[in-house]
Structures are given as C-alpha cells and as structure tokens.
Amino acid sequence: TPVNKIFVQDYRKKYGRYPTFYAAQSYDTIMLIDSAVRAVNGNLRDKDGMRTAMRRAAFPSVRGPFKYGNNHFPIQNFYLRKVVKDSEGNYTTNVVKTVYTNHQDTYAKDCKMSW
C-alpha cells in the first residue's frame, strides 16, 4: 500500500533497517488511537465516542484496509513471503502471493462477543 511504502521508507531512514511486523503493528496501534482521539476532538472523557471510533478503525493502516471482526480480531490479508537480499545486500521479504484475502479468525463464528 502507499502508506506501507512511506512507513518502510521513513523507518529505514531513521533506524537503518527494515521494520519488523511488530513495528508495523505498533504503528497501526498508535494510528488507531490517534484516529479515535481526533474523532472525539481530543475529549478523552467521551468514552462512548472513543469506543465507537476505535471500532470503526478509520485510519491509514500499513497493512491495507483494516476492520475488526465480531470477535475483535482484525480482518486482514495474509501473505506468503520469501526472504531475499535487496539491492544493498540487506535481507527483506517479498510477497510471493496472497494466501488469504480479508481473512477472519477461524473461530470468529463461535465467538459470543459482540460490539
């Protein structure tokens, strides 16, 4: 995604290496929180508004389109990746193919949670 490309470029510039998946998840987390705070105009006492905004997940994810399933797990794509060396000799991964598109957790259908 374009957001992912910018994230990787900025991360490499600052840290001199490719970001880990944990770094991407952390970035998404803070972007989700930021989108919720903006949705309530900074009024953190508006807990219902914060919850609604967090559920909506209207933020630019580095993983592409992002939404939650009924069990509060992300619905997202999964990829088969191959470790390769880039033009500078650094190890990175390339996407070989999309394994699952908009995949929801296998047990979501059994989950009794609801919004």
Residue ranges, per PLM feature:
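Extracytosolic ligand-binding ectodomains
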Residues: 1-115
